[in-house]
Curated annotation (Swiss-Prot):
Residues 210-306 form the PH domain. InterPro entries: EF-hand-dom_pair, PH-like_dom_sf, PH_domain. It comes from Gallus gallus. The PH domain is essential for phosphatidylinositol 3,4,5-trisphosphate binding. The gene is SWAP70. Residues 316-538 form a coiled coil. One of its GO terms (molecular function) is DNA binding. Tyrosine-phosphorylated. This is Switch-associated protein 70. The lineage of its organism: Eukaryota, Metazoa, Chordata, Craniata, Vertebrata. The SWAP complex consists of NPM1, NCL, PARP1 and SWAP70. It is found in: Cytoplasm; Cell membrane; Nucleus; Cell projection, Lamellipodium. Keywords: Cell membrane, Cell projection, Coiled coil, Cytoplasm, DNA-binding, Membrane, Nucleus, Phosphoprotein. It comes from the Eukaryota.
Amino acid sequence: MVGLKEELLKAIWHAFTALDLDRSGKVSKSQLKVLSHNLCTVLNVPHDPVALEEHFRDDDEGPVSNQGYMPYLNKFILEKVQGNFDKVEFNRMCWTLCAKKNLSKSPLLISDEDAFKVWVIFNFLSEDKYPLIIVPEEVEYLLKKLTEAMGAGWQQEQFDLYKIALNTSREGLSAWELIDLIGSGQFSKGMDRQTVSMAINEVFNELILDVLKQGYMLKKGHKRKNWTERWFVLKPNIISYYVSEDLKDKKGDIILDGNCCVEPLPDKDGKKCLFLIKCLDKSFEISASDKKKKQEWIQAIQTTVSLLRAGSPPPHKEARQKRKELRQKLLAEQEELERQMKELQTANENKQKELETVRKQLEAAAARAAEEEKKRLQTQVELQDRFSLELEREKMVRQKMEEQVAQKSSELEQYLQRVRELEEMYKQLQEALEVEKQARQDEETVRKLQARLLEEESAKRAELEKWHLQQQQTIQMTEAEKQELENQRMIKEQALQVAMQQLEQLELERKEALEQYEEVKKKLETAANNTRSWKDKVAHHEGLIRLIEPGSKNPHLITNWGPAAFTEAELEQRQKSWKGKKASSE
């Protein structure tokens, strides 16, 4: 419906423009009422005058603009169009409003009816922008169709000259200029008015009325079974047949859809060139005048059915759309080319400006270089004199610097020698510290060993005291248990002997540990003396180091908890006491 609306708007635009006498874009309300009523009548749309009054209620005085009329036209008329109207009658109504005010007063070789058909064809081929024009490509297409319909040869060179003259003045032709062009006979020289009129009518039937093919053929009746000559007209979805080609007496229609088909039939009953059109409800037997016409009709009907199945528009409408798309594509390419040319031109101008700027910069640079060269030559002599004085001064300074460097080198060598001596002393001091550290580690190891031995000794002593108490308890037992206790005492005595031996062994180990501790202590004192000696030497050289000597230690027994709470004499006294108690118990 969008395409139908655009086609209707073109004809309505002509009618509205004709009513706009002063070209101001405004038409009086009374004229719009008449136009709206006529449009509703020819388009089979119910007319609502109240809606028009309501739409323009704020503009009762004076004319109203076409911007205000367009919303009304779209809402109350065009949106209600269903397509069940006479296209020719609609166009003729719009033509009646605009023809008298726009047709040329000069005599034309075509009739008013032919001019009307050319005007309708113009609306079909014109561009979808206002004011309406037909571009030269579509003019060429139309003239070729007319020339072909007249059976004449196409004059391409003549049209090229006309096209060149046309392109220099405007983009295309208006409807009235196209009518003047065809009516002037410029491209139909040697043809009479009747031939031109027939050609216009043929092109009108094809492009506007969607007539794909027409002609006389015989049709077999369904009731009486007789053959009657009819004038057949093939359109995209229907085949209509009439009594004659004036289309006044219509006898019937053959409705086409995607389920229809056409088949050739063999000759029979004296009829030749037969073919059959099959539809859902009935079939039609047709007889053409010759085999060529038969094949043309079969091919045309098959093509029409194929288009119906595919949902495609008629060939001439599809071709028009393709031509428009091609023109749009070429126009886009041309605009892109023009844009690129403008960019190149702009870039070229920018380059020229840059070159001019560079040239000026080079000239200025050359002038500056000449001036600088002059200044350089002038200052060169001054610099040479100044450099000579500075050279003498530098020689004297260099001599003084060499003397200072020699003195500093000697001082540096002495300083490095002292540094090497200090490094050697530090190295020896580090070795002495390592020896002292190792001696302290040995002392700690011996101390831990002595503590472990004392702990084991204490455990054995506690065990011996426990056994002694048990022996005293066994003495107080009865005589009946004495023998058994004696045996147990002998066993315990043996165990006590073993424990005493272990205690003696531990005593020996403790003494050995004390001896090792004394040796380690001597080594530690020796290492401390060596460390103190080296530290004194380092302090003597540096004047900084002062060693603090540790105080002397008295030898004493060491346990896991520190110095022992008893002496060796007390330990021997306790051993004698334990032996005496053991002997008395026996």
